[in-house]
Amino acid sequence: KSSAASDVYKRQAYVIAKDIIHLLLTLQDLIKDDPEVAPYMKLVMVENYNVSAAEKLFPACDISEQISLASKEASGTGNMKFMLNGAVTLGTMDGANVEISELVGEDNIYIFGESSEKVIEHYEKADYCSRDIYENDKRIKECVDFIVSEKMLALGHKENLERLHHELVSKDWFMTLLDFNDYVEKKDQALADYADRKTWAKKMLVNIAKAGFFSSDRTIEQYNNCLLYTSDAADD
């Protein structure tokens, strides 16, 4: 209390994250109030996400979207839990998605986006410009501009929506626009494949069967043999 150096000041770290949540809640209201769309689509923001909520979501999921920018995800376990419950992954080559892809094969996963190496190269060269993509891609421009459209502004807060729009066009640190078109194409492919129930069931079974690789027994054994110590060292 007596040290001025320990004072904590307000920072901007989570402003964009809150703007994204605000965008989702605004879209939620927009979809809910549209009589032509509401019967076919629903957006739900799960608040206070915890284990109890996860126990309902994991078994119910058909497509697990793990869409972090390649090189940004260390390795979560959510995708493994979805996989064990039969969900098919749609994601980037990042985190445990890399191992899932190797296990199930390209026919049983939907991979999109730039590689980690390419993304890191963009950061090193500082040559990524979201505005160039925005101004030269009609579909991307239309989608980004929808954030600040009359329909959205009528339901949401102008400050939040305009700030998020500006972030995507002027900075886009996580290179959202870079992978956008590839994501849309893979999502469309996944939804089309989902319509073939027999083929989709096979994809689900492959994912369930291959999920055993992520068991704690196998993981602990590997840590023991490769990272912590070997049996020979233990004997010594």
Name every feature range the model reports, one short phrase each.
Residues 42-44, 66-69:
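Short, flexible loop segments at the rims of nucleotide/cofactor-binding pockets, characterized by
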Residues 59-60, 67-204, 208-213, 218, ...:
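Catalytic binding pocket for nucleotide-activated donors in carbohydrate/polymer assembly enzymes
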Residues 43-52:
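Catalytic cores of eukaryotic secretory-pathway lumenal/extracellular enzymes that build
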Residues 29-33, 63, 70:
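Conserved helix-loop functional segments at active or binding sites
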Residues 52-60:
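Short acidic alpha-helix that forms the nucleotide-activated donor recognition element
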Residues 3-44:
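Conserved catalytic-core segment of nucleotide-activated headgroup transferases in glycan assembly
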